Curated annotation (Swiss-Prot):
It holds the Pfam family Ribonuc_red_lgC. NCBIfam families: NrdJ_Z (TIGR02504). InterPro entries: ATP-cone_dom, RdRp_reductase_class-2, RNR_lg_C, RNR_lsu_N, RNR_NrdJ/NrdZ, RNR_R1-su_N. Keywords: ATP-binding, Cobalamin, Cobalt, Deoxyribonucleotide synthesis, Disulfide bond, DNA synthesis, Nucleotide-binding, Oxidoreductase. Its EC number is 1.17.4.1. This is Vitamin B12-dependent ribonucleoside-diphosphate reductase. It catalyses: a 2'-deoxyribonucleoside 5'-diphosphate + [thioredoxin]-disulfide + H2O = a ribonucleoside 5'-diphosphate + [thioredoxin]-dithiol. Substrate binds at S177, G192, C193, G221, N375, P376, C377, G378, E379, P520, T521, G522, T523, I524. Residues 7-95 form the ATP-cone domain. Belongs to the ribonucleoside diphosphate reductase class-2 family.
């Protein structure tokens, strides 16, 4: 450092940080690249001139930026100065917008992320104003979760709170939304989702409905198997009347979820599963196909078996069984029912399929029962009253010097497993059955987000063999690290109570019956500023609805690449926004077009291949949408569903573009056409309920 340079920089919030001339040089370099100024010595020369002009002491950040503008002007670099000034103006506008929202954002999140955090995550004072900053939100969650550490090593919670906070503040790992929302609050419910049982009695149906309302009020999602309810028209001995059937109660549950969500912090999200052998399966399959607005809070999935799908393949008959009596009440061609499922999914995305036999072959505690349902997005098959405590590693933050930082990935995975295990201990459970089930198996779900961004940063097309191989390797390493961490926790704290009844009883003890699961990540990937789960990018440039306006947004990875390589232009971005993607766009280099495919530009087979590759190293399940073009046929849906079964994934969802009104990503903007996204959309399914 020069003897006459500043020692410190005063940020806008008043904090002091060391002066770093490399940051000035990097900013000038980015501006120079945008105007194709290829003098390699210029940025360093300008940065040194700025440092010399500032002198010793403490330099306010605004003074530094003013000095950069002045030195560029003096050097006759007017084009570079113009780009630098525009960048400053945009940053100033962003700070102003955040200030108008009343949010202090030391994490430098996107405006969309800050908007969502303000509405649903940050604590507020009595006047409704945010009472904490974005960083303080992360600190609150870290402290709350780390409190569990004192149960096992008194006095250790402060140390672990600091480690947890580092992960959260760096956006290297984020837990599911309720952990961020409810940590340190009176609600205290930190688990993301639950499966609740519904038995064949009015008492059970309404008792479960009441429990669901309590969970949804606290931001928890709920999954149900309606398979035990007697079919419509069946005899009710106590009244002499007839049953209304599971679909009628499904509508009741949906209405209740809508009412609860009005007073809650996010829209109610639910999953309904009905066994393919239920006599009312045809009504269930078409429950949402008849009206796009029907059952808005529910995802629907048919619980299919290997026997049913083999009957489809050989054009055999399928038996429908009354769950009350266990007797066969009808037989129908399996292919006819499968066609009805595929037609409904083609029409609106529902129902998906849940492969019950595949799920139960991997059930870690088969002695505790057969799994019949999943959480709302399908990534965690659960027994009754079990919960999913989810968190995701941000793969986009696992890069160093243009390569995957495998050591950091394993370190983050290990700390994340400990975090999620602590969540089980500190979470409050509204009903004793929930706490008992959570502690019995201590299931957690460590997953990922940012896969598509990582691939793009490495120049690897999502729809390529190289991408599938890398995704496989990433998930294998994460699962191995998670297993190691869970075994270490078992040595410190003991195995999960149901260990002796588990598939692992003959192997070494584990703290958790399940450690990995890949969630869609929904809002948390938006907060982290990366792509959702293992989904591809949904658009490269688009407009996002924020506080009543549609603001142009560019994928951050593409934005950085375009500026670094010198082809960023405002008119270029406007053209891309009209298209959504860049595949087939002649103005960009071929390798850039290949590395930035959008979900709609990727063939369905590649979507499924990626899901299957990741599933091989995930103990629970993988939430992934197979996107289909608007021109896709029912036969295309049929082919994907069969291929998914044979690929041994645990569930499958398809979404044909434009098949549902109100989808959260569309090109239905006024002329000129622009890809549009809702405030909270970060990728994945553009039509189903994916709040988590």
């Amino acid at each position: 450092m020069g003897v006459s340079w500043p020692a410190k920089v005063r940020r806008r919030d008043g904090t002091l940080v060391p002066f770093d001339i490399a940051r000035i040089e990097a900013a000038v370099t980015r501006a120079a690249r945008e105007v194709a100024c290829d003098d390699p010595d210029m940025p360093g020369t300008v940065a040194k001139a700025v440092a010399d002009a500032l002198g010793r002491g403490i330099a306010p950040v605004e003074d530094i930026q003013d000095c950069v503008e002045a030195r560029l002007g003096e050097a006759g670099l007017d084009d570079v100065a113009r780009v630098y000034i525009i960048y400053r103006q945009r940053r100033a506008e962003l700070r102003t917008a955040k200030a108008l929202l009343g949010v202090r954002d030391e994490l430098k999140l996107s405006l969309a992320a800050v908007t969502v955090l303000r509405e649903r995550y940050l604590l507020h004072d009595e006047q409704g104003r945010p009472a904490e900053s974005t960083g303080e939100l992360m600190d609150r969650s870290a402290r709350c979760v780390a409190a569990a550490e004192d149960q096992y090593e008194p006095g250790s919670s402060r140390r672990w709170a600091e480690r947890f906070a580092t992960l959260l503040r760096n956006l290297e790992f984020l837990p599911n939304s309720p952990t961020l929302m409810n940590s340190g609050t009176d609600l205290g419910l930190l688990a993301g989702c639950f499966v609740l049982p519904i038995e064949d009695s009015l008492q059970s149906i309404f008792a479960t409905l009441g429990q669901a309302a309590e969970l949804q009020r606290a931001g928890g999602g709920t999954g149900y198997a309606f398979s035990h309810l007697r079919p419509a028209g069946d005899r009710v001995a106590s009244t002499g009347g007839t049953a209304s059937g599971p679909v009628s109660f499904l509508r009741l549950y949906d209405s209740a979820a809508g009412v609860v969500s009005m007073g809650g912090r996010r829209r109610g999200a639910c999953m309904a599963v009905l066994d393919v052998s239920h006599p009312d399966i045809c009504d269930f399959v078409t429950a949402k196909a008849e009206s796009p607005s029907e059952l808005p809070h529910f995802n629907l999935s048919v619980g299919v078996t290997d026997a049913f799908l083999r009957a489809v393949e050989r054009n055999g008959l399928h038996r429908l069984v009354n769950p009350r009596t266990g007797k066969i009440v009808a037989r129908m061609p399996a292919a006819e029912l499968f066609d009805a499922i595929c037609k409904a999914a083609h029409a609106g995305g529902d129902p998906g399929l849940v492969f019950l036999d595949t799920i139960n072959r991997a059930n870690p505690v088969p002695g505790r029962g057969r799994i019949e349902a999943t959480n709302p997005c399908g990534e965690v098959p659960l027994l009754p009253y079990e919960s999913c405590n989810l968190g995701s590693i941000n793969l986009a933050r696992m890069l160093a010097d243009g390569r995957v930082d495998w050591d950091r990935l394993e370190e983050v995975a290990g700390v994340a497993v400990r975090f999620l295990d602590d969540v089980i201990d500190v979470s409050r459970y509204p009903f004793p059955e929930l706490g008992e089930a959570a502690r019995a198996t201590r299931k957690i779900g460590l997953g990922v987000m940012g896969l598509a961004e990582l691939l793009a940063a490495l120049g690897i097309p999502y729809d390529s063999e190289e991408a599938v191989r890398l995704a496989t390797r990433l998930m294998r390493r994460i699962q191995q690290a998670a297993h190691t961490a869970s075994r270490r926790l078992a040595e410190e704290r003991g195995a999960f109570p149901a260990f002796t009844d588990s598939r692992f009883a003959r192997s070494g003890p584990r703290r958790n019956a399940q450690v990995t699961s890949v969630a869609p990540t929904g809002t948390i990937s938006l907060i982290a500023g990366t792509t959702a789960g293992i989904e591809p990018m949904f658009a490269i440039a688009f407009t996002r609805a924020i506080v009543g306006r549609h603001l142009l947004e560019v994928n951050p990875c593409f934005d950085r690449l375009a500026r670094d390589r010198g082809f960023y232009r405002d008119e270029l971005i406007a053209e891309i926004a009209q298209r959504g993607g860049v595949r087939g766009y002649p103005r960009l280099p071929a390798e850039v077009r290949a590395a930035f495919p959008t979900a709609a530009e990727i063939a369905p087979q590649w979507h499924l291949r990626m899901q299957a590759a990741v599933q091989r190293h995930v103990e629970a399940a993988v939430s992934k949408t197979v996107n289909l073009p608007a021109t896709a046929t029912v036969d295309d849906v049929r082919a994907i569903y069969v291929a998914a079964w044979k690929a041994k994934v645990k569930g499958i969802t398809v979404y044909r573009y434009g098949s549902r009104e109100g989808q959260v990503l569309s090109s239905a903007a006024p002329k000129p056409l622009l890809a549009q996204a809702d405030t909270e959309f970060s990728g994945g399914c553009a039509g189903r309920s994916c709040e988590f």
